[in-house]
Regions:
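Membrane-embedded alpha-helical bundles that constitute the cytochrome b-like, heme-associated redox core
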Residues: 1-186
Length: 186
């Protein structure tokens, strides 16, 4: 077991953890987006989808705990890698130049990550924590929240930042697992 812990503490091990947790969070996000797209089929379809999810009973909180754990592990590992990279550099460089491999997405990963965390909190406050009743369905919450121009702007910005974060994260995942390698380029 010590080799496993030693690997997880290494820089490469942390990158594996980031890639795996990011992949699993991305898979959840894909399923969540597909499910939420039922709103385009009408209020009844969306409310039926939400009712189906809540009918899963005890599996819902178990799944949520797993999801929160993945998210927590992803965030903590990301912060550790960010700090480790900062420490390895030994401070700011005298001349700010791009090494050729950095992109806007790669340079802003910690910041987009923090913004996404805030966005997720806003999302949970708006849609997860409010009590759903027979008088007020989930589609009513969506209409109410996204009917507010401020929240529409917040959601648009949050999704944009999420896309930027995931675009670099997906590329990093391919790099970490050796899938994006000159040997495989055509």
């Amino acid at each position: 077991m010590s080799w496993f812990i030693q690997t997880c503490r290494s820089s490469l091990g942390k990158k594996y953890i980031m890639a795996l947790t990011g992949f699993m969070l991305g898979a959840f996000l894909l399923v969540h987006t597909i499910g939420n797209s039922t709103i385009f089929w009408g209020r009844d379809a969306f409310n039926a989808y939400a009712h189906h999810l809540h009918a899963l009973g005890i599996f819902v909180p178990i799944f949520e705990i797993g999801l929160y754990s993945l998210f927590f592990l992803h965030v903590i590992t990301g912060l550790l890698l960010w700090q480790q990279n900062k420490t390895a550099r030994g401070g700011k460089y005298a001349v700010e130049t791009s090494a050729g491999g950095s992109t806007f997405a790669s340079k802003t990963m910690p910041y987009t990550g923090i913004a996404i965390f805030v966005f997720i909190l806003i999302h949970l406050v708006n849609f997860h924590f409010p009590e759903k009743t027979a008088e007020k369905t989930i589609s009513d919450f969506v209409t109410e929240v996204l009917g507010n121009p401020l929240f529409t702007l917040i959601y648009g910005a949050g999704i944009t930042l999420l896309f930027i974060h995931i675009s670099h994260g997906f590329w990093s995942l391919l790099q970490t697992f050796g899938i994006s390698h000159p040997r495989y380029d055509y």
